[in-house]
């Protein structure tokens, strides 16, 4: 994976969004990788997840506006649906998920 890292420390799974040059903005690839990472978590090996962003400037700067400006209407709708699906998966994940917010936490 290019933009998501996952590591286990003891009984804690740590997911890091790793696009610090783009302030960890969410693009299609980040959403796909985050979705796949959540699916791959061994829920018997960890007791909780920490979600954080790489670097000190930004946790997540919202959606990647650069990518969004290139999408067709249908692609934009699919991007929005994918984002909603991934966020719903985080909200309903069977383990506690802690957001370790470092820097900006923006929506959009």
Where are the predicted features?
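Conserved CoA-thioester-binding segment of acyl-CoA-metabolizing enzymes
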Residues: 1-52, 88
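Residues at secondary-structure transition points
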Residues: 3, 21, 25, 32, ...
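Histidine-centered beta-alpha loop that forms part of the nucleotide-sugar donor binding/catalytic region
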Residues: 18, 63, 102
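Hydrophobic pocket-lining residues within nucleotide cofactor-binding pockets
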Residues: 26, 65, 101
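Structured helix-beta-strand junction loops
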Residues: 44-45, 71, 93
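Glycine- (often His-adjacent) and acidic-residue-rich active-site loop
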Residues: 53-89, 105
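Glycine-rich beta-to-alpha active-site loop
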Residues: 89-108
């Amino acid at each position: 994976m290019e933009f998501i890292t996952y590591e286990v420390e003891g009984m804690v799974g740590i997911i890091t969004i790793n696009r610090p040059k783009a302030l960890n903005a969410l693009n299609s690839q980040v959403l796909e990788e985050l979705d796949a990472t959540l699916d791959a978590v061994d829920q018997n090996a960890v007791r909780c997840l920490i979600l954080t962003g790489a670097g000190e400037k930004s946790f997540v700067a919202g959606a990647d506006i650069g990518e969004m400006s290139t999408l067709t209407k249908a692609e934009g709708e699919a991007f929005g649906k994918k984002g909603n699906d991934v966020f719903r998966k985080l909200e309903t994940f069977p383990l506690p998920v802690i957001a370790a917010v470092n820097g900006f936490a923006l929506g959009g």
